[in-house]
């Protein structure tokens, strides 16, 4: 108070006022503070001070020719004095008004293109429907959400290169546009923005909105896709929510949704193959989502979901350090533990080997419909605070936490044997056995857990074993809260390793993810997912497997044929025949395979019995491990259309029909492609007959000496190579076969291989 009085007295003296208004500020520190750097230090003051002046704006000299000196009201629009320190003119705010009303107009054609994201937002809001407002407590939890709908998924660096190339094509600086999406976008935008008069900087800002995903950590109670987040301020408050249905979808949300579905399908399929990791990688690399390669999407898309993260880990990408159990994402917030193997007995006296976490730890658990804070010690749950959308969701979270706590009373609550298996028919690990058991029925678990009286704490209530709320009693250590638990905010990613069974571990060896954690929820993808891998043929059912298998053989017939005669075992082991096995009755697989392999060997041994159509028809049956038996078959059964259908060994059937006239194959009435047979098959030329017993390796190789005549060949030892002069003076490199059994086939492949070697 004293100080203020003193200042008032000082200000009443005219001398003080004069000093303050006339004296220059010459203290270096102050000058530095307000003038260093381009950042305005006091924007509000600056704005007030500028607008109080008559001509606060500077403009290019050319403006004088374009704007009159005075407007209709006779107010001056620009000053004749130049701006100090530049060759621009000083202009009044009134000049802006005049320009907006009377200035030149330009074509508006580029506006919707540059401000695309805004125009699209208006459309979505116009067609969206807002429902009633409900007043209720909102359980919001902070999640990392996408805040700009309609963006591509380029990294900041990739987008920067595209923007520079589109907006400032003549600027120097190395720009490398490598990814497919970069090139497509650049081409498209250059065409759209030809002769665009909008300020380049503005165009650059708008392009950034279109190309890069922007995320924020926001409290959300409902939908998290970007078309809901853009209206977050309209749909939920502290105590109210308004129903809203978006008036349109955006590609980025569709990509996220389709990516999750593709990843889940791929992980589920990989789990049941002989080498899950190799299969998973093969499928990720051969799958496209909405016409873009899945691996490109995985590299750019930050979606965190169990299956997506397993695919990322397999590709060597970093993922979040949190781990998944029972569909909840766990993040340790404090404490530490060491793991020890321990044997425990269930209520059914079954022995389980579990890895016990010894030590005090605190975790946050975040699921789709419930969240919780868990404090635990060695095999003991100390406290669990849950919040969720409904009774069911809360129960799910409690079960997961109880199992995770590894408490003895939970293990003793097991009734019956634990023998859950995964899709590949392998037993689940003990922790997942327990989880599945109680997810099926948790009555005994809740009854045996024990209850305790509770204190009255604001915002918290108790929950009884039958999952009803109570203010007096609660399950031991468990409370239900009105407040949600925020998702883990950090976007930090860690290096992980993955084993061939798709278990993902951090560098300390903790398991973060495994295929058991992948949701079984089925959904319909918004964008077309194209799985080129043979492993995904079965996703559309048995018929698709049948058609795809035969299409594959026909497409690759040239190489299949050579392998059929020279390295059949390698051919039989091709993964493309794996899906087909599920169509062959289990009991018959081995017998069919043995029969077909014997038949093929006879074809190889007896010249002239090479029957293309029959080889194609029977080849998939030879892929199963063969049983040696003398059985002969005239037809082979496949299970399609809900029953066994027959494929005739000799002749056509509804399943496999080859039309000699059109040379086309139909499988179950669907076209499977055309056969291009060698015209000289069966009447192979003299060279091929003479070269029987030799493998043609390719063009002449000078290291093996001068060319021999065909007659001199007989002196070669088995496995020896030589150049040979054939037919029209061409020279090819051959090797004498090590085995005699395959001699007869050479004449079929020789003609073609000679042709290939010469060309």
From Swiss-Prot:
InterPro entries reported for this sequence: Flu_PB2_2nd (IPR049110), Flu_PB2_6th (IPR049114), Flu_PB2_C (IPR049115), Flu_PB2_CAP-bd (IPR048298), Flu_PB2_middle (IPR049111), Flu_PB2_N (IPR049106), INV_PB2 (IPR001591), PB2_helical (IPR049113)
Span(s) of short sequence motif Nuclear localization signal: 736-739
An annotated GO cellular component: virion component
GO molecular function, one term: RNA binding
Function: Plays an essential role in transcription initiation and cap-stealing mechanism, in which cellular capped pre-mRNAs are used to generate primers for viral transcription. Recognizes and binds the 7-methylguanosine-containing cap of the target pre-RNA which is subsequently cleaved after 10-13 nucleotides by the viral protein PA. Plays a role in the initiation of the viral genome replication and modulates the activity of the ribonucleoprotein (RNP) complex.
Subunit note: Influenza RNA polymerase is composed of three subunits: PB1, PB2 and PA. Interacts (via N-terminus) with PB1 (via C-terminus). Interacts with nucleoprotein NP (via N-terminus).
Protein name: Polymerase basic protein 2
Organism: Influenza A virus (strain A/Chicken/Hong Kong/YU22/2002 H5N1 genotype Z)
